[in-house]
Amino acid sequence: MLSPMAKDEDSTAAPFDRVENTGSQSQSQSHSQSQSQTESHSHSQPQSHSHSRSHARSHSQSQAFSHFGSAVTPAASSTWGLGEPTPSHHLSSEASTSPAESWRLDEFVTDPGYLAYQEELRCLIFNTAQTAAPTREGTPEAADGGFSAGGFAAPGTILGDEGAARRQAGQILGTGRRLEYLKNYVGEVATWLDMFDSDRAFGIQVPVLARSSPALLYAVLALSARQMERKEGKQTSFDSLELYQEAIRLLTPLLQSRDQKIIPICTILCCLEMMSASAQDWRKHLEGCAALFESFYVHGFSGGLLQAVFWCYARMDLCGALISDGTESTLLTPSKWLPNGASHNEASELFHQSGTPDMHANYAVYLCAKVCELVADRTRYFELGDASGCSSPDELTDRWIRLWEDLQAWTRDRPPELLPVQSIQSSPFPQILFLHWAAISSNQLYHTACTLLLGSMPRPLNLKLGGVTGSAIWHAKCICGISLANPHQGCLNNAIQPLWVAGRLLSHKSEHALLVKLIRSIEAVTGWGTCWRIDDLEAAWGYKVRKELRIADMVR
């Protein structure tokens, strides 16, 4: 239960009731930078909303935040101390020599063929979404798309003879590096698609289905090839482009048939597009998938493969909301992540009913999306005078309190699989080690959601938030520490936006240097374009971090 708290925040009081809270939590208050400086330098807003952002910035900070708190500002140098990075920080060690050192528009993204096929796919998807929707939500069996009952190529389906399709798959894999791409997909790419799915739908079920679906197989190969090209720093001659185009060619008749089996294929192709997309284009690539999920009534509780595909999409949609920096919610509103007719008040029970660590982790994704929705509604209400997302400041306050309580209940009710196996005080960030894949990102999203909520705390409401739990700096350090201690590729991909949220609050140069090296390393290791966020962070910090700067240099 929340209770009034004293004016000055005591970040060392009442230890957080989990093992993460083992380090020093005090923070000094000097050298803080204003949020207005942070926001004015951000380069990450989608272009379609540049007008609203400009309009919002024209309001003074005091006017915009007078009723509903203020943005979290970068805090001062922490008393966590300095020192050499521990072995768990190895991700950043090779950043300065990475072939993918900064995000660039390579020839894949600018190729006229890619752009033409991308637009064709987008139009086909929207046409399918507009004409495919049933008159009511289907049964759970129908919602799974019939994957478990016959896969993509059962006799009599639109793909024809299953044996012929499998022979075609063998011919496809016999060309060039395609078998290598399939191995890379199973061993590397699928692990981050399956990050919140212990049943490994993308790693096991999708490759099995791809044997009888050339369109799905080409989509898998295209995504894997693109990831390898990004890691290798290729600038020309892309196998992924040919594979992408062939996947769309084969997908076209499936889209025209308005079959739910198109959804995994479209989501995988969306992942490929997102891997190289600029921040301005992020949401554009998600819009088609959002329309398909909505029109086919696929949600986070559909069951089977489609449920796994939905949560893969949902994590990308959440990243898009985080990129918008408080101006946008997710494309698919969080209410549509739940079964038809379910309300937010029922969400906790729905997620808990599954009794699995995966769904508890997905609950963290949902709660973070709800926080983004609240922050976006708050921005529109106070900065733009748009009351479409809420009716009054009191409603925003009630939603804020409810979400804060939901987040604390989430961390309190974590199953053993989502708890850290070790948490060690270290400098400049704590080391928080998890064993379960889903534990890594879900705990990081919990800290991200708390950071965002603390940055939009209602005023003049004073709440006792429970020691370090009420410290945005503590949450920011945990976000960074989790990524440094847990080098799972899927979790690193999903960490970029949380690291941006956290990084703006860091003030010491040792923290900045380590975070920049980490972000460079993530791009080099995973192939995802990430380094554009370094420019945003450096703009927020007010200086450029030298690539050769070492933590040891800061100690002197």
Where are these regions (language model features)?
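Intrinsically disordered, low-complexity activation-like regions
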Residues: 1-253, 257, 280-556
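Internal, conserved structured core segments that host functional sites
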Residues: 266-281
